[in-house]
Amino acid sequence: TDIPYGEVNRKGNGLRELDKENADILTFDMQVFLNEVYRVTKGTIIIFCGKEQISEIHKFFSEKQLLRKGTVRQIIWKKTNPSPMNGEHIYLSGIENAVWFKKKNATFNAFCKNTVFEYPIGSSNIHPTEKNHDLIAELISDNSKEKDLILDTCCGSGSTLLMAYKMNRRFIGFELNKSYYDLAKKRLDAEMAQMRI
């Protein structure tokens, strides 16, 4: 899942700031979220997050690791074509972070694989933080089997759900933003109709 970590406004030139009108991060309770996701997950948890959130998420799962309830790692998505946003003022942000936690005995199909994944950014421009479909497919393949259930608690435009469906996984997704919910539903309905042909 890709939790809220703030949207920037798109107006004007120069440095962009947090768009407080659309920032779910201001009302997002990380500890409640982590406890609930841990409680309902049987296998692996992957949480894409902002750099400011890594420590809190990693600490939560490190405590579970100390109790021998699983293993935690940081995943890095190295973007081969980072967005040039603010590039005239600062270094480009060429990576995205995720925290990966595998509960004991969970599926893992990626023998001796590195935690750095190199892919271009998503190309559809339908969501500001859309993930590359091949990246999502690789993570699903590495951490699940066919017919497993994929949960995306912040599904945005539905990319993870779409890839889960294409890879013969069951899925459940949640999205608070009505526009993104409608878009995700439309994408999934179209894919399901196409697969039935």
Language-model features: where?
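Core catalytic lobe of class I
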Residues: T1-D182
